[in-house]
Amino acid sequence: LFTPISAKMIDNVHLLEVIDALHPTPAVSGHPSNPSSLLRSKYEELDRGWFASPIGWFDSDGNGEFRVALRSALVTNESTTFYAGAGVVEGSDPDRELLETDVKLRALLGPVVASTKEDL
């Protein structure tokens, strides 16, 4: 599921200003964002890194396209860290949310395992 947003930019507004105003999305940050952010910093032990960050491109004419990085991996020489999440809301079933996250992470794991085997 996604909600495409398109717009004709106002001349004195840069695309990155719009991205900044839209980030983080309520789907990954909660709403309203300030109380949600405080709760996350209190209870969430993991640094989200680039998870749910806007990724995309823009050019000198003001054209561009961005997405929210809902699944990602941070690869270093020493380790690989995968990021995925589930939309936990009132009434969510924790077991189903965990299963959803597991399915998302497995989709990321396959290509990394395949490339590691080639390097051996």
Role assignments for model-derived ranges:
Residues 37-65, 69:
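Hydrophobic alpha-helical bundle architecture
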